[in-house]
Every structure is written in structure tokens, then in C-alpha cells.
Curated annotation (Swiss-Prot):
It comes from Streptococcus suis (strain 05ZYH33). NAD-binding protein involved in the addition of a carboxymethylaminomethyl (cmnm) group at the wobble position (U34) of certain tRNAs, forming tRNA-cmnm(5)s(2)U34. One of its GO terms (cellular component) is cytosol. Its cofactor is FAD. This is tRNA uridine 5-carboxymethylaminomethyl modification enzyme MnmG.
Length: 638
């Protein structure tokens, strides 16, 4: 079929949510002429659910996006109303930053960034069809029958694909927040041969801030100590004029209201068919699943500086509106609260992610990438992390350059993508620190050390960011060398100072670094003996030094494990392998290998249902196959 294209692009991104903006910005910043298409220009980087960025594991993802050259970290640093470091009483591996966002300002600031980006065109249009010829993407067709050519297309449609909002027994076609649903494109993805699933998520009601009795709630302030998501943000710009959140709880009356109305709950009446998120369940689901719990936490989160809307975190529901109102009034502090928006559930189509490569390109169609909730994840941060990887790889494909695959040891983004493409998901996927086997080396404080060089290599990290990183890295390296080179001796003068500071006296000579390994000794304590560094070190560098020194032994063990797995990852599995040709492999393993088509031995070993014996048989088979090919080549050469 011959197509007449109105405009020509290198990359087209469908959807301008959190995945879409990162994909569009990445591709355009790497030099590709890019179209970012959205159903509604007023919903660019919109937050249809919680007004926050970050949190456990997610906050580390935002740092990783920033380290690669992405925008989410910088944008939230410009638009937060509260910043808080979580899990400070725990180890460094699980600490993560969380910010309350000014929801409207976050979206408008990101839209401004997109509008000003060179090589990037932002357009309001409905994409109805992805045009494919000979198994390759060639462009898209809009609802108004305009055709645009492209060498790569990234689908980041969020919950809009055949979206349906559900409140009680009311069910209607809609994307998030009553936007248009994308129905024709959902049909098109099926026609292209992709396996489609059906998931569900939800959002809580919003209440009027002026109708809350705050005296009956617990105030939750932000941090006074400066913290940022972006490695480019400066401590002097930290906002001290923050807005608090408040904590309250459900109670026996709340639970009784829910239990007596379960027959009207879409989740239990059969109206909801999609599979919901395990780690962000609705309040009715929580009451049923955790019937022994007397109460559940609810956080009252402001949606911005210029609105009275309060997001009731923990009260996600699709119960009928009258039940939602009764439920709100049963909660301490909300007895007279006015509901401004009802909570709702939303069902949507998604692409089963086992059909993707680790680049987020579909295996079936060359040049077609998917990212975000389209791939079955939940959360803005998970979406943005996939978006930047899909955008990078779309650009690299167009440019004919080697692809980018982030390993599990590179970052939480790598963990997430590997989980999705290797194990698939049967429910909305959420990142957790427990999913990462190398979490001690995947911390929030070292994201730039892990990923900024990668971002520079692919052409996404600009000169400003690269210079900031180089200064930070050089300061860290130089100070680590200094701590290793200076020795403290157990002489009288030194030990008097050690004891005066509340530490046990030295019995042997040791380096400043070894002294810092004592649990109660800080970097500042070590500096009291050895003097300050040649250059002033910022809080980020000092935090990194303390963590690397105190956990050096554990970090070394983790890096050894990474090296062992690296050898497995380097053993490639040929794309043309015939899985039926391998004798003795278990039936379940054979079925999983056929379904997922692992690209490396490492990936094959992580597929659920595959045991070590299957991997051993596979490795023996591949070695024999390699020898056979070498012999045939040798015969042919003679």
C-alpha cells in the first residue's frame, strides 16, 4: 500500500504522560526529529492519581532518570510543596526521597520544557493506527486521517487504551480524569498481533481543605535539611516554605460502612473485570483482605498551593458516591468534609510485556516500542523510567547505533524492565526495594555514579550535567584516596582526642578510612583528625563517602555477585534457536523459553519455572551447537 505522509519524523511518541514526555525529550535531545502526540494538550505530564513523586524504590528511579539526562527530577525540584527523605532510621539501601507536588504547576512546567525543546513537536491529536509494512513501523494515522511517517514509534498511552471509569454501577468509556479513551488504537494493537491484557487501577476521592478539622489529625511536615531529586539542583534553592500533610485513620464505623455495602462494590459485584494492583489496593479490598486490622492509615495530601483539593491517600475506591460520602464522614477530622471529586476505578488494555525485548521494542514489529502503564506497570516513576529507555532506544535504532540495555546491576530501571520482559506480570507491577538483589549498590546517593556515563555515551547527558558530574566524581575519588592514605597512630595526643569525642581509644595504627568504618564515627569526626579536603565537599558527596566507607565489605560482595552474573549475561542465545531440538529439558522450561525467547543465559535463568538443571542442559546444547557451526565453517573454508 502506498502512503502519502503529511509530515515526516524520525520518532513518534503516542501519549504525553510521564512515560511519553521522557521518551519524547530523550529522542529529541539525541538529535531525532520527534513528534509527541497527545489526546489533550492540557494533560501533558498530568497527575491523575496521587500528587507526589518518589517514595520507596520510586525515589531512586527518579534519581536514575535524572542521572541519565531525563527531566522528572528537575521538574519536581521546581514544583514541590513538600520534600521528605523516607526510611532514615534504616540502612542506606532503602532510603528514598519523596515529594508532594503542586499538581498543576508540575504539569505546566513540564509542558513548558517540552514546548521549548529543539527537535520536538507537541501536538494534540488522536492516533488511531500504527502503520506497519514488512514487519517494520513506517508511521501513524490520526483520527482525522492525517498520516505521519516515522522510523520508530513509542506507545505510551497509560490507562487510555479502551479505558472505562467505574463508580458503583456506573461504567462509561473514558481515559484518566474523564479524558477521551483511545479505542481504535487499542483495536489496532490487537490487529498487529500483540497479546493484550486488561488491568485495573483506581484513585481516592478528593475533599475540600477548608472543611477538614485538622485538630483531630496528626501533622506530617517536610524536611528542613535540603534534599533534591536532581543532581543539578542546589541546596541554596531548597524550599523551606513547605505545606504539611496530615495523618488520620479509618475505624470500626468506616469498616462497617464498607462491609455493609460490598454488594454495591464493583470489585465484588462483578462489574470490574480487570486485575488490580496488589500493592495499592482499594480500601474495600483492604477491609476484606485484612479483616483483622482495626484501622488503616490515611494521609491527607494537598494537591497544590492554589487549590483546596486534598487527596485522601489510602482511600482508593470505586464504591457508589453516596457510600463514599458516608465513608469520608466516618473518619476522624473528616466528619464535615465536602467531597470535591469522587474516587473511581479505571479499567484499561495493556500490552503483555513478555512480548518485549529489554530495549522495550516489541519482538514482533521492528521499530515499535511500548512504555509505562501500557506495559502493565503502575506509578508515574515506573512509567518515566521506561519512557526514557524506550526513547533512547528508539533514537539509537533510527541512528543505527548499538542499543541500550540496562542490567539489573545498573539500576532499579534495569530491574523493572528485566522483571517485565523476563517474568511478565499478571497484575499492575510496582517497584519495591525487595525486587532488587543488588539493592546495596542501587542507592539514591550513587545514581549518577552508576548511570551518568551511560547517559553521556548515548548522547543524552549535556555538557552542563557532565561537568557537574565530573566535579562530583573527582571530589569523591580524591577524598577516598586521601582517607586511605592518612594514618592515625595510637599515640597519647590522638587517643586523648578520640576518647574526648566519646570513642574507644586506638590500639593499632589505622587509616582515616578504617577509623570511619566504626559504626559511630562520621566523616566529620574523621576530618577533625585529618583536616578538611582541599575542596569544599557538598552534602551529596559526604553522604556518598560515608556510605561507601561504612558498607565497603558488603558492597564488595555485591560487586562480586554482579561479576558472576555478568558472565551469564554475556552468553548470548541465538535468535534462531529451535527449543524443540534440545533434549532432556523440562516441558515447563521449554514452554517458557518459547514464550519469552530469552536473549542471554542470564535472562533464561531468571524465568520463573526454569531450574538450574534446565540452564545446564541449555548451556551444553549451545556449546555443542557452537562447535558444530565452527566445524562446518572450517569444512567450507577447505
Amino acid at each position: 500500500m502506498t502512503h502519502t505522509f503529511a509530515e515526516n519524523y524520525d520518532v513518534i511518541v503516542i501519549g504525553a504522560g510521564h512515560a511519553g514526555v521522557e521518551a519524547g525529550l530523550a529522542a529529541s535531545r539525541m538529535g531525532c526529529k520527534t513528534l509527541l502526540a497527545t489526546i489533550n494538550l492540557d494533560m501533558v505530564a498530568f497527575m491523575p492519581c496521587n500528587p507526589s513523586i518518589g517514595g520507596s524504590a520510586k525515589g531512586i528511579v527518579v534519581r536514575e532518570i535524572d542521572a541519565l539526562g531525563g527531566e522528572m527530577g528537575r521538574n519536581i525540584d521546581k514544583t514541590y510543596i513538600q520534600m521528605k527523605m523516607l526510611n532514615m532510621g534504616k540502612g542506606p539501601a532503602v532510603r528514598a526521597l519523596r515529594a508532594q507536588a503542586d499538581k498543576a504547576e508540575y504539569a505546566s512546567e513540564m509542558k513548558r520544557t517540552v514546548e521549548r525543546q529543539e527537535n520536538l513537536t507537541l501536538r494534540q491529536t488522536m492516533i488511531d493506527e500504527i502503520l506497519v509494512e514488512d514487519g517494520k513501523v513506517i508511521g501513524v494515522r490520526t483520527a482525522t486521517n492525517q498520516k505521519f511517517s516515522a522510523k520508530a514509534v513509542v506507545v505510551t498511552t497509560g490507562t487510555a487504551l479502551r479505558g472505562e471509569i467505574i463508580i458503583g454501577d456506573l461504567k462509561y468509556s473514558s481515559g484518566p480524569n474523564n479524558s477521551l479513551a483511545s479505542i481504535t488504537l487499542a483495536d489496532n494493537l490487537k490487529e498487529l498481533g500483540l497479546e493484550i491484557g486488561r488491568f485495573k487501577t483506581g484513585t481516592p476521592p478528593r475533599v475540600n481543605a477548608r472543611t477538614i478539622n485538622y485538630e483531630d489529625t496528626e501533622i506530617q511536615p517536610g524536611d528542613e535539611k535540603p534534599n533534591h531529586f536532581s543532581f543539578l539542583s542546589k541546596d541554596e534553592d531548597y524550599l523551606l516554605d513547605q505545606i504539611p500533610c496530615w495523618l488520620t485513620y479509618t475505624n470500626a464505623t468506616s469498616h462497617e460502612i464498607i462491609n455493609s455495602n460490598l454488594h454495591r462494590a464493583p470489585m465484588f459485584s462483578g462489574i470490574v473485570k480487570g486485575i488490580g494492583p496488589r500493592y495499592c489496593p482499594s480500601i474495600e479490598d483492604k477491609i476484606v483482605r485484612f479483616a483483622d486490622k482495626e484501622r488503616h492509615q490515611l494521609f491527607l495530601e494537598p494537591e497544590g498551593r492554589n487549590t483546596d483539593e486534598i487527596y485522601v491517600q489510602g482511600l482508593s475506591t470505586s464504591l457508589p458516591e453516596d457510600v463514599q460520602q458516608d465513608l469520608i464522614h466516618s473518619i476522624k477530622g473528616l466528619e464535615n468534609a465536602q467531597m470535591m471529586r469522587t474516587g473511581y476505578a479505571i479499567e484499561y488494555d495493556m500490552v503483555m510485556p513478555h512480548q518485549l525485548r529489554a530495549t522495550l521494542e516489541t519482538k514482533k514489529i521492528s521499530g515499535l516500542f511500548t512504555a509505562g502503564q501500557t506495559n502493565g506497570t503502575s506509578g508515574y516513576e515506573e512509567a518515566a523510567g521506561q519512557g526514557i529507555v524506550a526513547g533512547i532506544n528508539a533514537a539509537l535504532k533510527v541512528q543505527g547505533k548499538p542499543e541500550l540495555i540496562l542490567k539489573r546491576s545498573d539500576g532499579y530501571i534495569g530491574v523493572m524492565i528485566d522483571d517485565l520482559v523476563t517474568k511478565g506480570t499478571v497484575e499492575p507491577y510496582r517497584l519495591l526495594t525487595s525486587r532488587a538483589e543488588y539493592r546495596l549498590i542501587l542507592r539514591h546517593d550513587n545514581a549518577d555514579m552508576r548511570l551518568t556515563e551511560i547517559g553521556r555515551q548515548v548522547g543524552l547527558v549535556d555538557d552542563e550535567r557532565w561537568q557537574v558530574f565530573q566535579i562530583h566524581k573527582n571530589q569523591f575519588d580524591n577524598e577516598m584516596k586521601r582517607l586511605e592514605s592518612i594514618k592515625l597512630k595510637p599515640i597519647k595526643e590522638t587517643n586523648e582526642k578520640v576518647v574526648a569525642m566519646g570513642f574507644k581509644p586506638l590500639t593499632d595504627a589505622l587509616t582515616a578510612k578504617e577509623f570511619m568504618r566504626r559504626p559511630d564515627v562520621t566523616y566529620a569526626d574523621a576530618v577533625a583528625f585529618i583536616g578538611p579536603a582541599a575542596e569544599d565537599l557538598d552534602a551529596k558527596t559526604i553522604e556518598l563517602i560515608e556510605t561507601e566507607v561504612k558498607y565497603e565489605g558488603y558492597i564488595a560482595k555485591a560487586l562480586d555477585q554482579v561479576e558472576k552474573m555478568k558472565r551469564m549475561e554475556e552468553k548470548r542465545i541465538p535468535a534462531d534457536i529451535d527449543w524443540d531440538d534440545i533434549d532432556s529439558i523440562a516441558t515447563e522450561a521449554r514452554q517458557k523459553f518459547k514464550l519469552i525467547s530469552p536473549e542471554t543465559i542470564g535472562q533464561a535463568s531468571r524465568i520463573s519455572g526454569v531450574n538450574p538443571a534446565d540452564i545446564s542442559i541449555l548451556m551444553v546444547y549451545l556449546e555443542g551447537r557452537s562447535r558444530s557451526i565452527s566445524k562446518n565453517k572450517s569444512k567450507d573454508s577447505h
